[in-house]
Amino acid sequence: MTYELLNTIDDPADLRRLDRRQLGPLANELRAFVLDSVSQTGGHLSSNLGTVELTIALHYVFNTPEDRIVWDVGHQSYPHKILTGRRDQMGSLRQLDGISGFPRRSESPYDTFGTAHSSTSISAALGMALGAKTKGEDRVAIAVIGDGAMSAGMAFEAMNNAGVYKDLPLVVVLNDNDMSISPPVGALNRYLARLMSGQFYAATKKGVEKLLSVAPPVLEFAKRFEEHTKGMFVPATMFEEFGFNYIGPIDGHDLESLVPTLQNIRQRAREGGGPQFLHVVTKKGQGYKLAEADPILYHGPGKFNPQEGIKPSGRPAKVTYTQVFGQWLCDMAAADKRLVGITPAMREGSGMVEFEQRFPDRYYDVGIAEQHAVTFAGGLACEGLKPVVAIYSTFLQRGYDQLIHDVALQNLPVVFALDRAGLVGADGATHAGAYDIAYLRCIPNMMVMTPADENECRQLLSTAFAQDCPTAVRYPRGAGTGVTVQPTLEPLPVGKAEVRRTSTAPAGQRVAILAFGSMVAPASAAAERLDATVVNMRFVKPLDVACVLEMARTHDFVVTAEEGCVMGGAGSACLEALAAAGVATPVLQLGLPDRFVDHGDHAALLAQCGLDANGILASIRERFAVQPRAAAPRVA
C-alpha cells in the first residue's frame, strides 16, 4: 500500500493542516502501516488497530504537545508514535537501541508521561492540569484510559480527587473496547454527542439549576427529567457524581462524530467547564479481520505474515515456564480441593486458561487490581483455603503494602507465582521483574524460591504450596531449558541448595559460583571453562547458610549470580551470611546493574549486563585473575 497522506505527516501540525475529509483515508493508511510494522517487528497489535481514529482525532483537535495526552498502559500508542515523528523508526520498535513499545518522555516531547502499568493516566493528567493552572498556562490535559484499566482503584481515586476542581481543564477519554457498540443511528447519534458536549446542553443545564435555586419543586422535577431523559442514551450517573461532564458513548471509529465532539469538549475545558469525560467505544483489531476475530491471539504477536496470519512454527517448542505453572496448578487443584487460583486480569498471560475451564468455581479474576488481589488472597487463606496468586513480578510491586501488612504480618499461607522474573526482552524496563528478590527477602515470614529449570519450577511450586507461611516462586518468561518435567507433586527440602559441579582446580584458582534460578545454566557453562564449582541455590530465603559458608571456606573465591538487581538481592544475602560468620573470602556479585535495563532481545540484554556465560567468565577473570582451562572450547 502507498502512504500518500501518511508520508506528508511528520508531526501533528502537519495533521492539523489536512481537510477533515482527508482524515478517513489517512486512517486507512495509518492502520495499514501499523499492521505492516508490527508484522515485521512483533509487538502489540489488536489494541493499536483499535485506536487509529481516536489517535487521529485527538491530535487533530488538541494542540499537542502543548495540550498533554497521557496514554494509559501505553501499548496502544503506536499510531501516536507514527503521527509524532517516529514513522521511520517503527522498524526498530522494541528492538535493542530502538524505540520503545510504550510512551517514554526521553523519546519525544509528545510522550508527556511514561506509561506501561495500568490506571495511572488520570492521576498524571490531573497533576499536569493543576500544574498548568498553578503556573497560569493555558493548556488541556487528556487521559486516554481503557483496556480494563478503569477497574483499578487508582483510576477512581484520581477521579474522586479531580471532581472537586470545577473549572479544571482535564479530559478523560474512556476507550471502551471490551464491549461492542450498537449499530449507529446515523445523524441522531452524532447530533446527541455534539449536543451533550456543546454549549446548548451546558447552558440549558446551568439555566435549569438556576431556576431550581428559586423554585425547589421545579428543580426537583427538572433534575428527574434530566436524569431520566439523559439516562435513555448514556450511563452518565456514576461519572457525573464524580464531578465530570459525561459525554457518550460514541463510536470511536467514526471520525465524523469524534472530531466535532472533541472540539466541543476542548472548548468547554478551556473555558472553565470543569472535568470532561468522553466515552468512546472501539473494537480491538479493527480493520484486520483475523485480529477482530481473535484479539487475544493478536494482542502481542511476534513476527508474522499479514496475509496468512499467525501460524504455528511447525518446530517442536520447548515448554514454557508459564505452561509448567498452568499444568502444575491444575494437577495440584485436582489433588487438593483447598487450592484456589487468583489472577489480576492476566488469565492467558499467566497460564490459567485450563484451570478456569476445569475449576471455574475455584478461579478468581479480580481485574486489574493487584492490591485487592493480594488482600483478597489473604482473606481466602483465613478461611482455610490455599490461594495461589498468579502475577507478573513487576505487577506484584503494586500490592507491596498489602503483601507486608495483610499477608506476611499475619503469616498467611498464600503462594505467589511470579511470572516474568528477571529481564523480559522487548517489553523493557517497565515490565522487567528486576526487584522481587530484593523486595521480598526483607519481609519477615516470607519464603523465596528460584528454580533453575522447568522441572524444578514444578517441584518448588509444590514446595511452596506445602508451607504454612507466605511463599514466592519466581520464574522467567519464555521457554525452559528443555529438561523433562516429571508429573510428581512432591516438595523439595526447604532451604537446601544443590551442588551441580565440583571444582578440581588447584589452590589459588578454586572458584565457587552460587547461582540463583535462571543463572544456573550460564554459570554452569562458564564453570566448564574455569573448572569452577557450581551451586544451584534454589532458595533465597531461607538461604542455605551452611552451604554458603562451606563454599567460602573450601574455595579461594566466591561468585554470586542472579537475574535480579544486585543491590539488596540474593548476593547481598550471601554476603550478609559470610559477614555474620566472620568469613572473609573474596566475593564477586553478579546481577542486574543499578540502572533500568532497556528493551531488546533477551539474550542480547543478558550479554549487555554480563550475565551470559561469556560475561560471567570475563568478570571472574578480571576480578580474580583466574585462568581458564586451555583445552576447553570457547563458550557459545
Curated annotation (Swiss-Prot):
Q: Does the keyword Transferase apply?
A: yes
Source species: Ralstonia pickettii (strain 12J)
Q: Does the keyword Protease apply?
A: no
**The protein's name in its UniProt record:** 1-deoxy-D-xylulose-5-phosphate synthase
Name of one Pfam family that matches: Transketolase_C
- Which keywords label this protein? Isoprene biosynthesis, Magnesium, Metal-binding, Thiamine biosynthesis, Thiamine pyrophosphate, Transferase
| PROSITE patterns assigned to the protein according to its UniProt record, in alphabetical order | TRANSKETOLASE_1 (PS00801), TRANSKETOLASE_2 (PS00802)
Task: List the record's Gene Ontology CC terms alphabetically.
Answer: cytosol
* Amino-acid positions noted as binding thiamine diphosphate in the UniProt annotation, renumbered to this chain: H75, A116, H117, S118, G148, A149, N177, Y288, E370
Q: What is its EC number?
A: 2.2.1.7
Q: Where does Mg(2+) bind?
A: D147, N177
The free-text cofactor remark is: Binds 1 Mg(2+) ion per subunit. Binds 1 thiamine pyrophosphate per subunit.
What does it do? Catalyzes the acyloin condensation reaction between C atoms 2 and 3 of pyruvate and glyceraldehyde 3-phosphate to yield 1-deoxy-D-xylulose-5-phosphate (DXP).
What is stated as this protein's family in its record?
A: Belongs to the transketolase family. DXPS subfamily.
Q: What class of enzyme is it?
A: transferase
Pathway assignment: Metabolic intermediate biosynthesis; 1-deoxy-D-xylulose 5-phosphate biosynthesis; 1-deoxy-D-xylulose 5-phosphate from D-glyceraldehyde 3-phosphate and pyruvate: step 1/1
InterPro entries, per database record: Dxylulose-5-P_synthase, THDP-binding, Transketo_C/PFOR_II, Transketolase-like_Pyr-bd, Transketolase_BS, Transketolase_C, Transketolase_CS
Q: How does it assemble?
A: Homodimer.
Task: Name a biological process GO annotation.
Answer: isopentenyl diphosphate biosynthetic process, methylerythritol 4-phosphate pathway
* Record GO terms (molecular function): 1-deoxy-D-xylulose-5-phosphate synthase activity; magnesium ion binding; thiamine pyrophosphate binding
Co-factor(s): Mg(2+); thiamine diphosphate
**CDD domains for the chain:** TPP_DXS, TPP_PYR_DXS_TK_like
Catalytic activity of the protein? D-glyceraldehyde 3-phosphate + pyruvate + H(+) = 1-deoxy-D-xylulose 5-phosphate + CO2
